[in-house]
Amino acid sequence: MIKIVLNGCCGKMGKVITECASKFNDLQIVAGIDKFPYETSYPIFETPEDLNLDYDVLLDFSRAGALKGLLNLTEKTKKPLVICSTGFSDEDLALIEEKSKTLPLFRSANMSLGINLINSLLRKVTPLLYGNYDIEIIEKHHNQKVDSPSGTAVLLADTIKESINDETKFVYGRSGASKREENEIGIHAIRGGSIVGDHDVIFAGVGEVIELSHKAISREVFAIGALKACEYMGNISIPGLYTMDDVIGITK
């Protein structure tokens, strides 16, 4: 049995993860970390420093501001940390990269199987289409999401950029009077209502448009992905920065 400590257990995703965990025979949430606790089947600690029990995997589905405290705890326990939060700064990402040299860390901007398959497809199709097709990314989320563009949109944009043997640049939204340049990758964010998460990658050519689209119907898809990452990382002790590609067996 893999024992999980869930940071952000009282948030929207934390509650969904707690519910979904009961469907996994090899996983058990033994404790949570949250500043605003509510009644659960497991004990809740207000900060990582307060945690006083043993665990196998630390799962974070909260906000970027929790990162340093979680890394401090991970350095003490040497147990795997699964990072599912988004909104990290370049400094945060560099810190994760540095700490992964000595700790087993997992990070993904999106935990769904579908998004990660699309991300894998982008590595293959982008080199074939770039130059003849303009590339734009549109992401839509609920009106309570605080980071923009979404971590998933950034993930997809980075994959596209890395797949192109050219100097490309990101353009966030469009306004004013200016013509689109060939080497631009447009990224656009929409916020409204209760949209769980929609992502469209558009390759617009002459006479045709190719789209890769993903629509999340329920938060459960992210919860299941996070728990599968815990299953995978529960058997990992070697330092490194692991991703959903490792969990689902995608070869780059």
Curated annotation (Swiss-Prot):
Pfam families recorded: DapB_C, DapB_N
Catalytic reaction equation(s): (S)-2,3,4,5-tetrahydrodipicolinate + NAD(+) + H2O = (2S,4S)-4-hydroxy-2,3,4,5-tetrahydrodipicolinate + NADH + H(+); (S)-2,3,4,5-tetrahydrodipicolinate + NADP(+) + H2O = (2S,4S)-4-hydroxy-2,3,4,5-tetrahydrodipicolinate + NADPH + H(+)
Positions of NAD(+) binding: G8, C9, C10, G11, K12, M13, C84, S85, T86, S108, A109, N110, M111
Primary subcellular site in the record, as a coarse category: cytoplasm
Positions annotated as active site in the UniProt record: H141, K145
UniProt pathway: Amino-acid biosynthesis; L-lysine biosynthesis via DAP pathway; (S)-tetrahydrodipicolinate from L-aspartate: step 4/4
Keywords for the protein's UniProt record, in alphabetical order: Amino-acid biosynthesis, Cytoplasm, Diaminopimelate biosynthesis, Lysine biosynthesis, NAD, NADP, Oxidoreductase
Location of this chain's protein in the cell: Cytoplasm
Cellular component terms per the entry's GO annotation: cytosol
SUPFAM superfamilies referenced in this protein's UniProt entry, alphabetically: Glyceraldehyde-3-phosphate dehydrogenase-like, C-terminal domain (SSF55347), NAD(P)-binding Rossmann-fold domains (SSF51735)
Entry annotated with the keyword Cytoplasm: yes
GO MF terms, alphabetically ordered: 4-hydroxy-tetrahydrodipicolinate reductase; NAD binding; NADP binding; oxidoreductase activity, acting on CH or CH2 groups, NAD or NADP as acceptor
Residues the record lists as binding (S)-2,3,4,5-tetrahydrodipicolinate: H142, G151, T152
Domain of life: Bacteria
Function: Catalyzes the conversion of 4-hydroxy-tetrahydrodipicolinate (HTPA) to tetrahydrodipicolinate.
Stated name of the protein: 4-hydroxy-tetrahydrodipicolinate reductase
Organism per entry: Clostridium botulinum (strain Eklund 17B / Type B)
Lineage start: Bacteria, Bacillati, Bacillota, Clostridia, Eubacteriales
